[in-house]
Structure formats: structure tokens, C-alpha cells
Design a protein with these regions (language model features):
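Short, charged/polar N-terminal "headpieces" of proteins
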Residues: 1-62
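Short, surface-exposed, charged amphipathic helix/loop patches that serve as local interaction elements
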Residues: 46-125
Length: 125
């Protein structure tokens, strides 16, 4: 038997499945070319529940140069540092992800998770 929260999540997923998708017209061919050029590419799905829309932004993993720039700028202003990350990793997608503050902020939160996708272990020899 599902609890109330699980039921609400299922209902929300059903509603969101009907949202129109805005992805900037990115095709499978374009995504494949990005993968060949940049290696790993991620899609960030942003659901704007107030507008009833789903926006997709495509990003590459940050390079060492990008991470260095983000680190340097973030010392003065964390939001500007996140903007550096966004601009340097953005490949394409819904133009609103670049221009609407709420959508962009949501995408930035997801980009922060890119740093947590690899895990390390240190072993004494």
C-alpha cells in the first residue's frame, strides 16, 4: 500500500507527462555530435509547474579550466561563479533556460550535482 506522498508523486509525474516540451529543437543528430565532441553530455529537465511546461537544457561536463574559473569567480560572488559554469557548459536547449531566472537557477542546481557523479576511495598500501 502506497503512502500519501508516494501517491502525490505519481500523480505529479502523470500531470508532468502531459506538459509540452521545449528543447530548442535539438535533434538526435545534434546530441550525438555533442557526445563525440565533448564526451559525456547531460540533459537537465526542468518542470515549470506554474506554467505547465517542461524545459530541457543540454550541458557538457566542465573542463579543468572551467572549474578553475568557477572557483576564482566564486570567491567573490557564488552566483557569478555558477553563471560561469552555466555559460561554459551550456550546449543548447530551451532558450528560456538561459533567460528565465527561475529556470536558470533550477538548472544551476542540477549542474552542481555534476561534481558528485564520481566517487573516490583512498587506500593505504
Amino acid at each position: 500500500m502506497e503512502n500519501k506522498q508516494q501517491q502525490e508523486q505519481k500523480e505529479l509525474a502523470t500531470v508532468r507527462a502531459g506538459y509540452p516540451v521545449f528543447d530548442g529543437g535539438v535533434t538526435d543528430e545534434v546530441r550525438q555530435s555533442w557526445k563525440q565532441a565533448h564526451g559525456r553530455v547531460v540533459a537537465v529537465d526542468i518542470y515549470d509547474d506554474m506554467a505547465g511546461e517542461r524545459h530541457i537544457g543540454y550541458f557538457r561536463r566542465p573542463s579543468m579550466d572551467t572549474m578553475s574559473a568557477v572557483s576564482a569567480v566564486s570567491r567573490q560572488d557564488e552566483l557569478k561563479g555558477a553563471e560561469v559554469m552555466f555559460k561554459n557548459c551550456w550546449l543548447g536547449g530551451s532558450p528560456l533556460v538561459q533567460n528565465a531566472a527561475i529556470l536558470k537557477t533550477s538548472a544551476l542546481g542540477a549542474l552542481g550535482e555534476l561534481f558528485a557523479t564520481c566517487h573516490t576511495e583512498l587506500k593505504n598500501l
